[in-house]
Amino acid sequence: MSAKDVKFGVEARDRMLRGVDILANAVKVTLGPKGRNVVLDKSFGAPRITKDGVTVAKEIELDDKFENMGAQMVREVASKSADAAGDGTTTATVLAQAIVREGAKAVAAGMNPMDLKRGIDLAVEAVVADLVKNSKKVTSNDEIAQVGTISANGDSEIGKFLADAMKKVGNEGVITVEEAKSLETELDVVEGMQFDRGYISPYFVTNADKMRVEMDDAYILINEKKLSSLNELLPLLEAVVQTGKPLVIVAEDVEGEALATLVVNRLRGGLKVAAVKAPGFGDRRKAMLQDIAILTGGQAISEDLGIKLENVNLSMLGRAKKVMIDKENTTIVNGAGKKADIEARVAQIKAQIEETTSDYDREKLQERLAKLAGGVAVIRVGGATEVEVKERKDRVDDAMHATRAAVEEGILPGGGVALLRASEQLKGVRTKNEDQKTGVEIVRKALSAPARQIAINAGEDGSVIVGKILEKEQYAYGFDSQSGDYVNMVSKGIIDPTKVVRTAIQNAASVASLLITTEAMVAELPKKAAAGPAMPPGGGMGGMDF
């Protein structure tokens, strides 16, 4: 085990504070509509330009072990806020820095760190209660667009795209952000359920121009096993032929005699049929087939459930208004499933999302949820250069998470105003002793930091702006740093999602109070470089003849 370097008390906190300041100062220049860009060096390719707080925070690694510990703790604040609300990372970092600075001063002055922490916790509780009380539900499409615009740094085009996407796929729908191949940013919406499996044989194609299978008012057979024998399928095919409706088969695979018969029947026009492979693998495949069954009002045919294919009748098949299959994807639109069944399945998937600890599983569950609940929207971000596209994509990502958060918990006045107003409520918080009171005071001072920083980034005097905002009683009154005017923030469309503001203060206070209560730090001592090998003896060059 290598030797360790141990620091105590004031020295430990000072080194840690230096790291906090380096990271926070790099991140906070991005705050607000007039925030600046940060250029990140990449080991290969062009440098990356971003205005996203968490992206900057993740790049920072310091040489000094103790400073680095402080920086990494604050980086945790930014990434936790990004995970929970998808935005508000810079606000959280600014708040954490302000609380740590004031807290470190109080500890150095001899106050009890644990009482300071209790005071901070009491203050945060009161702030969150005030934010929730003043939160306003998002009702209109315009408000969603405003939230998106603010998060995308005042880019109203991005706000409008997000509002359109949410309108089309619903609040539960999946919105993905990709890089476009063109200069323009565009929105592409897939309604209904789409999965990434195409037709098994091109002979099933009905629209030769687009190389696509299109079927209206189709029956859907959902089978878990491979289909190779024709005998087990025959009774069902005869029943479907009599209805005159098309049939789509979703199975692990269709091969041999079964595939040949289906293709021949399709070409002779006796039966409109198409077959696709089942999506996913293993347990996820079973779950997705069950989703398709619930969406279409059919049954997943599985021998585990004791259902044999030869015993299947028409009532066990799913139905859909339209099914489209191309080489790579299958889309089922307007399935005939009962609304109550679909809602129950959605609730079940939501519960699984809450419980899962794996990011990959969560992402896959959210995809399944979207396919059941609404659809998938893809925003393709365009730009003149690769650097511009990446920077824009960062902003669209932020804005997408912010609009989701706004729909979930409502909105508050932006520009740091909601936190400023909440600081006024802390005067009435009751504490048990003076040290706890100081803890509350630390948070009260810190709550003005985001509004002050936004003003500083816009070239104004932060303290003057904060003073003027607090002079007015009106809750939504604040400073629009884009235009330089004092306005009603909500009616001007400068709004923040409640969830973003709430998680920012909770995460900042949580990590900051840990830093304040730190009394010792342990880091590995840098290893001394081993001495190099001795030089060979001087003289002639070895192995040479003269």
From Swiss-Prot:
Known catalytic reactions: ATP + H2O + a folded polypeptide = ADP + phosphate + an unfolded polypeptide
SUPFAM superfamilies per UniProt: GroEL apical domain-like, GroEL equatorial domain-like, GroEL-intermediate domain like
GO cellular component: cytoplasm
Alphabetic keyword roster: ATP-binding, Chaperone, Cytoplasm, Isomerase, Nucleotide-binding
Localization (cell): Cytoplasm
Chief localisation class: cytoplasm
A GO BP entry: protein refolding
Residues binding ATP: T30, L31, G32, P33, K51, D87, G88, T89, T90, T91, G415, D496
Annotated GO MF terms: ATP binding; ATP-dependent protein folding chaperone; isomerase activity; unfolded protein binding
Residue stretches spanning the membrane: none
InterPro entries: Chaperonin_Cpn60_CS, Cpn60/GroEL, Cpn60/GroEL/TCP-1, GroEL-like_apical_dom_sf, GROEL-like_equatorial_sf, TCP-1-like_intermed_sf
Listed EC numbers: 5.6.1.7
A Pfam family hit: Cpn60_TCP1
Oligomeric form and interacting partners: Forms a cylinder of 14 subunits composed of two heptameric rings stacked back-to-back. Interacts with the co-chaperonin GroES.
Free-text function comment from the UniProt entry: Together with its co-chaperonin GroES, plays an essential role in assisting protein folding. The GroEL-GroES system forms a nano-cage that allows encapsulation of the non-native substrate proteins and provides a physical environment optimized to promote and accelerate protein folding.
Family recorded in the similarity comment: Belongs to the chaperonin (HSP60) family.
Protein name (Swiss-Prot/TrEMBL): Chaperonin GroEL 2
Species: Bradyrhizobium sp. (strain ORS 278)
